[in-house]
């Protein structure tokens, strides 16, 4: 059991019964020339976020936490995105951008394409779980809840992009399903102006979960890492 300093109060949990969730660290959201960039959002500050996620992932893996990677997107015909009868069709900025710029059709958030791929600096490893998701929330139309419950996992540590969209949506849905959600604020980035980040973190810390940072997370986990390695050797 570790105790993680967080706002509004510290939270205790067992690393091996917890998961680190990396939300949508795809070229679409973190790279120049990706969907967010093409849609007019600023992605120039994502480099430190990528580095911090790498740090958090390494610490979590050493402590025996499950790592779950999400990739947001759809088939290349966008059937999974929903047609005009779906609010997603009208509100998705990726779909709107492609309607405004037909030359991008089939390129944004399409499975198998560069936009959909995780950034080069972040690579899932054996034992990690990679899940596609068709909407903002990682709980909608995915096996996430089943994966977590079958492993006895109740605490979820969130990183990724965008704090105010997919990260917050997934954490909120987890709250309604009785999961404890923690966001590492310096391992996330918003879609939109800086106040969107602050508003999302305020909502999470006040109503739905807890907010911490990568340094605190790694420091809290450091005593757990040798225990996880010892357990692996014992059962090898």
UniProtKB/Swiss-Prot annotation:
SUPFAM superfamilies: Isochorismatase-like hydrolases
Cited Pfam families: Isochorismatase
Known catalytic reactions: (Z)-3-ureidoacrylate + H2O + H(+) = (Z)-3-aminoacrylate + NH4(+) + CO2; (Z)-3-ureidoacrylate + H2O = (Z)-3-aminoacrylate + carbamate + H(+); (Z)-2-methylureidoacrylate + H2O + H(+) = (Z)-2-methylaminoacrylate + NH4(+) + CO2
UniProt record, GO biological process: nitrogen utilization; uracil catabolic process
Superkingdom of the source species: Bacteria
Disulfide bonds: none
Enzyme Commission identifier(s): 3.5.1.110
Matches recorded under Gene3D superfamilies: Isochorismatase-like
Entry keyword annotation includes Cell inner membrane: no
Keywords from the UniProt entry: Hydrolase
Active site positions: 24, 133, 166
GO function terms (MF aspect): hydrolase activity, acting on carbon-nitrogen (but not peptide) bonds, in linear amides
Protein family (similarity comment): Belongs to the isochorismatase family. RutB subfamily.
Functional summary from the UniProt entry: Hydrolyzes ureidoacrylate to form aminoacrylate and carbamate. The carbamate hydrolyzes spontaneously, thereby releasing one of the nitrogen atoms of the pyrimidine ring as ammonia and one of its carbon atoms as CO2.
NCBIfam families linked to this entry: RutB
Name of the featured protein: Ureidoacrylate amidohydrolase RutB
């Amino acid at each position: 059991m570790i105790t993680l300093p967080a706002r509004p109060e510290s939270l205790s949990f067992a690393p091996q019964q917890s998961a680190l969730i990396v939300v949508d660290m795809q070229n679409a959201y973190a790279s120049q020339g990706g969907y967010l960039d093409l849609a007019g959002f600023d992605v120039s500050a994502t480099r430190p976020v990528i580095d911090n996620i790498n740090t958090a992932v390494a610490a979590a893996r050493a402590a025996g936490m499950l790592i779950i990677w999400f990739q947001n997107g759809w088939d290349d015909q966008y059937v999974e995105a929903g047609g005009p009868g779906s609010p997603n069709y009208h509100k998705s900025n990726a779909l709107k951008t492609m309607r405004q710029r037909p030359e991008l059709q089939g390129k944004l958030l399409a499975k198998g394409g560069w936009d959909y791929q995780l950034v080069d600096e972040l690579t899932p490893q054996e034992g990690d779980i990679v899940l596609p998701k068709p909407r903002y929330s990682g709980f909608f139309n995915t096996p996430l809840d089943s994966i977590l419950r079958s492993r006895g996992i109740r605490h979820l540590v969130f990183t990724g992009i965008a704090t105010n969209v997919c990260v917050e949506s997934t954490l909120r849905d987890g709250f309604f399903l009785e999961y404890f959600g923690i966001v590492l604020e310096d391992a996330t980035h918003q879609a939109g102006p800086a106040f969107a980040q602050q508003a999302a973190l305020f909502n999470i810390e006040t109503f739905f979960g807890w907010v911490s940072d990568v340094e605190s997370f790694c420091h809290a986990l450091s005593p757990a890492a040798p225990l996880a390695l010892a357990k692996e050797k014992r059962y090898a």
